[in-house]
Amino acid sequence: MAEEISDLHDVRNIGIMAHIDAGKTTTTERILFYTGKNYKIGETHDGASTMDFMAQEQERGITIQSAATTCFWSRQSHDTKDKFQINIIDTPGHVDFTAEVERSLRVLDGAVAVFDGKEGVEPQSETVWRQADKYGVPRICFINKMDKLGANFYYSVDTIKEKLGATPIVMQLPIGSENDFTGVVDLVEMQAYVWNGTEELGAKYDTTEIPDDLKDKAQEYHEKLVEAAAEADDDLMNKFFEDGDLSKEDIRAGVRKLTIAKEAFPIFCGSAFKDKGVQPMLDGVVDYLPSPEDVPAIKGYKPGDESVEIDRHPVKSDPFAALVFKISTHPFYGKLVFVRVYSGSVVPGDSVLDSTREKKERIGKIFQMHADKENPMDRADAGNIYTFVGLKNVTTGDTLCAIDDPITLDSMTFPDPVIQVAVEPKTKADQEKMGIALSKLAEEDPTFQVTTDEESGQTLIAGMGELQLDIIVDRMRREFKVECNQGKPQVAYRETIRKAVMDQGYTHKKQTGGSGQFAKVLMNFEPLDTTEGKTFEFENKVTGGHISAEFIGPIEAGVKEAMESGVLAGFPVVGVKATVTDGQMHPVDSSEMAFKLAGSMCFKEAAPKAKPVILEPIMKVEVRTPEEYMGEVIGDLNQRRGNIQSMTDGVGVKVIDAKVPLSEMFGYIGDLRSKTQGRAMFTMEMDSYDEVPKSVSEEIIKAQRGE
């Protein structure tokens, strides 16, 4: 069985988060090496990192899924006896995979935010920082790539203050920079750690005096650190006023208190790739990030009654409660369910309740994961992260709990997809497998959706960006052996009428020997307000028995059938109120079929006179952009026939709300990124259907007619 520490005080559940290419996965690889979890270092650029185990991750050098592992660490800078268990989740940095970050942060107690020492805070750094704010996750910061040309520690610290609105507490100063970066000054211990290159892979470093050229600066920053720590509580402030200084233990206690309260963020620095600075940062993880005991009790509610609040504490004596934060598919074990256990404990073979779905589930096996390797466990206890096997109907965001003491924990919310692509299988064999593959992939990723277009019959896959959908198609090919073609889906246009046509008559009469066909109808067709979601209304105003009741239904069915294909471009017609006012029937020749045909033809003859128009889907678009790009973003939205609704201030950004036709939004994600250097982000959702301008309408009609 895998090793596990029983005292929760010595457990840390952390995530590694950053903008893409800040060195997040490389930092994680060094952590695994120095903690003894890995015996060799896998490099991202070689496609060999432990945590990026998917083929697509190794080829592209990016993290796509959040991977979990557990390692152990004893401090090196002070108090070296205690051994800590660190459960780590390495999350993606690419904007297309923000859902992976979102669901990881939901179950973590703390995080390490990795920044590029040259760039400082980058766009996706801002995004993941806001996500961590949303879930109240305390963070320490690691300014990485201090060996990089142009690296500037002090600039990077300033960007954390200015762009994130955060309060940084500098815990270290770099010794040298770029090629001359050799180590760090510890501002608590007031000593230097230098990696001289004689020890392989930076596993050992020398503890020395602070270099002469840094002594004054180190003293200045030490005093700032002491003053910041003293702000943590009244006792520390009194000690500071009495003595003019604080002990090392008091400094750490004050910084820890501020960090857990999310009032400040300790700053460390190094170069993970050059094997410098990672061990002191690990000391910072155990010194300043919370244990499960430091986090408030998880709140939930009684299933079916949100007014009854329930607390669960991270102790084995409380009833079992866990949150499912990720699902993945294993070639041998099938569905792997990743959970954070908040209270109680379970063993393999136990039955639990999925309170979200009100279904019982049985736990087959319990693992702790090391990337894609499974380490068996004989139990799952409060405060830790595990993987369960054997659960059938569970999905991301579900609560698992004790059957006799049910609770439902707050789930997770994910953004709606912003881009969709049509896929079609290449062969009949692929067609049969494609449905299974897509349903499994959709189960793994909450932002990936699969739908079928009712008009075209196309299978549409939707997600957060083109890269995400490319990966999905690639995974279908590799993992499920499904070959498919990708295309662009057509916008789902509609038609409607703008003018009422009254007393439209139609007589259906056919005599071919034997019983004939006869039906006569008189109808009104009027525009119908569709804002309440109603697209069609039918009313019967026939009096005097001119049309038998049995024929009214077929008239309605005939009108509906005719509305499936509009007169302008063959799009479905919406927004029509049809009223049958009079008519005539024959005692022998009238039939349901005759009246259905009469209703259908009556609408077809009325529609051209009713001022038909084409409608297009209008999207509600929100763009968050740094102020310097606002003019360009607004100009671009106007060119896309957008209608700006409002402009407001967000945290360090401008928020633009607009309504834009869906047809103009294809490719927008790439254009927006290029116009704003990747610093803006947007979301969109369906708002309404609106009339297409005449010039655009003419182009659509020509395209539909193949002209």
Swiss-Prot record:
GO terms for biological process: ribosome disassembly. GTP binds at residues 18-25, 90-94, 144-147. The keyword Thylakoid does not apply. One of its GO terms (molecular function) is translation elongation factor activity. Residues 9-293 form the tr-type G domain. Its main location: cytoplasm. PANTHER family: RIBOSOME-RELEASING FACTOR 2, MITOCHONDRIAL, TRANSLATION ELONGATION FACTOR G-RELATED. Belongs to the TRAFAC class translation factor GTPase superfamily. Classic translation factor GTPase family. EF-G/EF-2 subfamily. This is Elongation factor G.
